[in-house]
């Protein structure tokens, strides 16, 4: 359920659930969709035939979000360590 940033196959399928301000300051590509919007309307943002990579600051919010989305039938992975770990590189 977790994946390293280097293992992401399609950066177009990255979903960054941080605030738009955080996303604009530093991002790894993909789309910025707040966690609440993503969980309220996953069918609007996601296709059950695709794989998505959920990222947040530390990896904890993305992991909980990923668990919920996977339970709903979506194929999602949480980016381990989040943006904070990536900034340390």
Region annotations inferred by a language model:
Residues 25, 40, 88:
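Phosphate-coordinating loops and pocket residues in cytosolic domains that bind phosphorylated ligands
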Residues 1-30:
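Flexible, polar/low-complexity N-terminal or interdomain linker segments that lie immediately upstream
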Residues 12, 30-33, 52, 76-77:
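Hydrophobic anchor at the start of a short beta-strand
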Residues 21-23, 39, 60-62:
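Glycine-rich nucleotide phosphate-binding loop and flanking beta-alpha elements
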Residues 33-41:
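Glycine-rich, highly charged phosphate/nucleotide-binding loops
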Residues 1-3, 16, 38, 46, ...:
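Residue-level detector of functional hotspots within protein domains
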